[in-house]
Curated annotation (Swiss-Prot):
This is Germacrene A acid 8-beta-hydroxylase. Glycans are attached at N407. Involved in the biosynthesis of germacrene-derived sesquiterpene lactones. Hydroxylates germacrene A acid to 8-beta-hydroxy-germacrene A acid. Unlike 6-alpha-hydroxy-germacrene A acid, this compound cannot undergo spontaneous lactonization. It is a single-pass type II membrane protein. CDD domains: CYP71-like. It comes from Helianthus annuus (Common sunflower). InterPro entries: Cyt_P450, Cyt_P450_CS, Cyt_P450_E_grp-I, Cyt_P450_sf. One of its GO terms (cellular component) is membrane. The keyword Iron applies. Pfam families: p450. The keyword DNA-binding does not apply. The chain crosses the membrane at residues 2-22.
Length: 488
C-alpha cells in the first residue's frame, strides 16, 4: 500500500508539475530553486521550521517565494512587510486556505482560526470577542483559576525539595482551567475530551504531506489516513453531542456560572443572528477553545520559568517584585496590574517563544506586495518569530532581556509588527485576554509561594534551549525544577 501511495504521488505530481511550470508568473518574490515534484519541501525543518525559514529569508529577502509540493507559498519575515500584509492589505489576505485536517477536525473549518473570511467568520468573531473571550468574561472565570491553583499548591507543597516536571504540572492545571471555563464544572467527560483533543492536535500539527498536494486528496483515502482522522473525529463528536445534551437539559439557577457552552447555546437559541449557527459550529468552537486555549498558555508558562531558571537575576528580580506588591497570600487581579517587571518577563517570553508562524493566510485575488506579483490562491506565511528577532528592530534580538520593553508602548494588540504573538489585523487571536489572564496569574502566584532551583549538579547554562514546534514552540526536553515551598 505504501509503495502504491508513493508511486501515485510521483506520477500524478510529474503531470501536474509540467502544467504548473508553464504558468508560473515571472515576477514572483525571490526564493530558492525548486526541485521537480517536491518544490522546496525538503528545505522545511519539521522540528523548528521558523528557524530555517528565517535563515532562508536572510539569503533571499524578507518576502520569499517557496513551492511546497503543489502549493505556491510566500513567506514574510520582516515587521515592515508584516505591516503590509496584516494592515495595509489586510482585507486582501484575510482568507484561510482549505486543508484536509481543518475540514475534518473542525467541522468543515467552522472554528474561528480556520474559517474562510466572510459573513460566518465575522459573526463568530463578534460572538467570541463580545461574549466568550472579552476581558469581562475572562474575569468571571477568576474563581476557577484560584481553585485550580489551590490544587496545584497541594502537589507542589508535597513535592517541595524534589524535582518535578513543570510541564506536566502546568498542563494539568491549565487544562482544568480551560475545560471548566468551556464545559462547566459538572461534565464527567472533561478528561476524555482533553485527552482526545491533545491526540487530535498532535495529528493536526504533524507534517501532513497531503496538505501540500491538494489535488491528490484521494490518496488520503487509499492510504487509510483519512479513515484514522474520521474515526478520531467521530469519537470526539459523540462526546460533544452528549455535552450539548447535558447543558440543554440541566436546570439553571440565577446565580449559576455560565460556561462557554452555555453562552453558545443561549446565543444559538435566543440570539439575534445574521446567520443561524448549528451544533456543529458550536462543537468547532469548543474544540478550538480546548486546543488553542490550553497549549499556548501552558507553553508560555513553561518557557517563562525556563528562561528565569537560565537567568537567576531575572528570577530574583521578578520574585522580589511580586513579594513586595502582594500583601496577602494570593495574587489578586488588582495586584497583577502593579506587577510591571513580571509582565515584562512574560512579554519577553512571548517575543522569543510565542507562536512562531501565524496561521496561514490566502488571497482570493491577484495582489502586488513590495513590487512582486502574488497570484490569487497563494498561501502566505508570516514568520512572527523572525519579526520578533529582526536585528533592525531589536538590539541583541536572540537574548532574553525583559528590560527591552521598559518605557515603550509595544503591546499585544498587533499595532507593533515587530511583536505579534497573537497576530494582527482582522485575524488577530480573539483569545488573547483569556490566555494572558491565565498566564499572568499563574506565573505571579508561583513566584510568590515558591523558590525554585535546578536539580543537584545542574547549572543554568546546562538547560537545553532547543525546541520543537506545534501551535507554539516548547522545549525539546521538559523543564525539571525543584519547588521550595515558603509555607513549610
Amino acid at each position: 500500500m505504501e509503495l502504491f501511495t508513493i508511486f501515485s504521488i510521483v506520477v500524478s505530481s510529474l503531470i501536474l508539475f509540467t502544467f504548473w511550470s508553464l504558468k508560473v508568473p515571472k515576477n514572483l518574490p525571490p526564493g530558492p530553486p525548486k526541485l521537480p515534484i517536491i518544490g522546496n519541501i525538503h528545505l522545511l525543518d519539521k522540528i523548528a521550521p521558523h528557524r530555517n525559514l528565517r535563515n532562508l529569508a536572510r539569503k533571499y529577502g524578507p518576502i520569499m517565494h517557496l513551492r511546497l509540493g503543489q502549493v505556491s507559498t510566500v513567506v514574510i519575515s520582516s515587521p515592515r512587510l508584516a505591516h503590509e500584509i496584516m494592515k495595509t492589505q489586510d482585507l486582501s489576505f484575510a482568507d484561510r486556505p482549505t486543508t484536509t485536517t481543518s475540514q475534518i477536525f473542525f467541522y468543515k473549518a467552522s472554528n474561528i482560526a480556520w474559517a474562510r473570511y466572510g459573513n460566518y467568520w465575522r459573526q463568530m468573531k463578534k460572538i467570541c470577542t463580545l461574549e466568550l473571550l472579552s476581558a469581562k468574561k475572562s474575569r468571571s472565570f477568576f474563581y476557577i483559576r484560584e481553585e485550580e491553583l489551590t490544587r496545584t499548591y497541594k502537589f507542589l507543597d508535597f513535592s517541595s525539595g524534589t524535582p518535578i516536571t513543570l510541564r506536566d504540572t502546568i498542563q494539568e492545571m491549565v487544562n482544568n482551567v480551560v475545560s471548566r471555563a468551556t464545559l462547566g464544572d459538572v461534565s464527567e467527560d472533561r478528561q476524555f475530551i482533553i485527552d482526545s483533543t491533545y491526540t487530535m492536535l498532535k495529528s493536526f500539527n504533524s507534517f501532513n504531506l497531503f496538505n501540500y498536494y491538494p489535488s491528490l486528496s484521494f490518496i488520503n483515502v487509499i492510504s487509510g489516513k483519512q479513515a484514522q482522522w474520521l474515526k478520531m473525529h467521530k469519537e470526539v463528536d459523540v462526546i460533544l453531542e452528549k455535552i450539548l445534551r447535558e447543558h440543554r437539559s440541566r436546570p439553571r439557577g440565577k446565580n449559576d456560572h455560565e460556561d462557554l457552552v452555555d453562552v453558545l447555546i443561549r446565543i444559538k437559541e435566543t440570539g439575534d443572528l445574521d446567520m443561524a449557527i448549528t451544533d456543529d459550529n458550536i462543537k468547532a468552537i469548543i474544540l478550538e477553545m480546548l486546543t488553542a486555549g490550553t497549549s499556548s498558555s501552558s507553553m508560555t508558562i513553561e518557557w517563562a520559568f525556563t528562561e528565569m531558571m537560565r537567568n537567576p537575576k531575572i528570577m530574583k528580580k521578578a520574585q522580589t517584585e511580586v513579594r513586595s506588591v502582594v500583601k496577602g497570600d494570593r495574587v489578586t487581579e488588582a495586584d497583577i496590574q502593579n506587577l510591571d517587571y513580571t509582565k515584562l518577563v512574560i512579554k519577553e517570553t512571548l517575543r522569543l517563544h510565542g507562536v512562531p508562524i501565524l496561521v496561514p493566510r490566502e488571497n482570493q485575488e491577484d495582489c502586488v506586495v513590495n513590487g512582486y506579483d502574488i497570484p490569487a490562491k497563494t498561501r502566505l506565511l508570516v514568520n512572527a518569530w523572525a519579526c520578533a528577532t529582526d536585528p533592525d528592530s531589536w538590539e541583541d534580538p536572540d537574548s532574553f532581556i525583559p528590560e527591552r520593553f521598559e518605557n515603550n508602548s509595544i503591546g499585544y494588540s498587533g499595532a507593533d509588527f515587530e511583536f505579534i504573538p497573537f497576530g494582527a489585523g482582522r485575524r488577530i487571536c480573539p483569545g488573547m485576554n483569556f490566555g494572558m489572564g491565565t498566564v499572568e496569574y499563574v506565573v505571579a502566584n508561583l513566584l510568590l509561594h515558591y523558590d525554585w532551583k535546578l536539580p543537584d549538579g545542574m547549572k543554568p547554562h546546562d538547560i537545553d534551549m532547543r525546541e520543537i514546534t506545534g501551535i507554539s514552540t516548547l522545549p525539546i526536553h521538559p523543564l525539571k525544577i525543584v519547588p521550595i515551598s515558603l509555607s513549610k
